[in-house]
Amino acid sequence: MSKSCGNNLAAISVGISLLLLLVVCGIGCVWHWKHRVATRFTLPRFLQRRSSRRKVCTKTFLGPRIIGLRHEISVETQDHKSAVRGNNTHDNYENVEAGPPKAKGKTDKELYENTGQSNFEEHIYGNETSSDYYNFQKPRPSEVPQDEDIYILPDSY
């Protein structure tokens, strides 16, 4: 009799806990549906399209604005800054100018080419001794042709 009473008590406690879990989930769903309009899922800023970024920025900046030193830029520095802005990799690539590369004083080849005279008999590393493969020559075919032909015959059983 005591075993059946224990089983009933366990079943009732599991049932009540599942019922409470169901009630909590229901309240959470109702709260989410009521507040769904206020909180919308948005992508991170770098994944948004440029037009949607403008909409988000205009919505967020409708309140009072604080203007710092960054916004007070003269015309000369603004032109320079817009030219530098094209090189920023975080900006959108819509307004980047494309064209042939500009001629520079030094080309990449001149920068990386080793123009210094080097002694080829010296090793690159001072402590390296000459190895067996340093003056390696391919074996020459013998000038005397071999008259013997070698045949390998299978074992006969």
Swiss-Prot record:
The chain crosses the membrane at residues 11-31. Residues 78-108 are annotated as: Disordered. GO terms for cellular component: Golgi apparatus; intracellular membrane-bounded organelle; plasma membrane. Highly expressed in spleen and PBL, detected at lower levels in thymus, and undetectable in all other tissues tested. Also expressed in various B-cell lines, monocytic cell line THP-1 and NK-like cell line YT, but not in T-cell line Jurkat or HeLa cells. It comes from the Eukaryota. InterPro entries: Protein_GAPT. Changing residue 145 to A: Abolishes interaction with GRB2. It is a single-pass membrane protein. Pfam families: GAPT. It is found in: Cell membrane. One of its GO terms (biological process) is B cell proliferation involved in immune response. Keywords: B-cell activation, Cell membrane, Membrane, Transmembrane, Transmembrane helix. Negatively regulates B-cell proliferation following stimulation through the B-cell receptor. May play an important role in maintenance of marginal zone (MZ) B-cells. Interacts with GRB2. Belongs to the GAPT family. This is Protein GAPT.
